[in-house]
Amino acid sequence: MIEFKLQSQCFLHHWNNYPEERGLLFTVNNNASDSYQGAVMKAMGVVAGVSDMVYLHPSGAMLLEFKTPKGRQNDRQVWWQGQVEKAGYRYIIIRSFDDFTALLDR
């Protein structure tokens, strides 16, 4: 499964099964369509490497990165994960639908 399909499957599962939490799991749109848009987004605060989604779970914020089983983080993603964890937040790499549902069951 490719990353965007996994992310979509997980989001829809959460949306449909946890209606009381709607809006607490959301995507971070940090992909510019061209260099001009990229410059505008950077000036507005877009940071390279941020996680794919933010989950404002009742037990605390979690930053979720979706990767295929063989997918690897790039250098900026590794750096950002370190920043997140130093600040005391949870950064979780989701590699399967089962990883995601296990997270919800915590």
Residue ranges and their predicted role:
Residues 1-106:
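Catalytic phosphate/metal-binding cores of nucleic-acid and nucleotide-processing enzymes, i.e., regions
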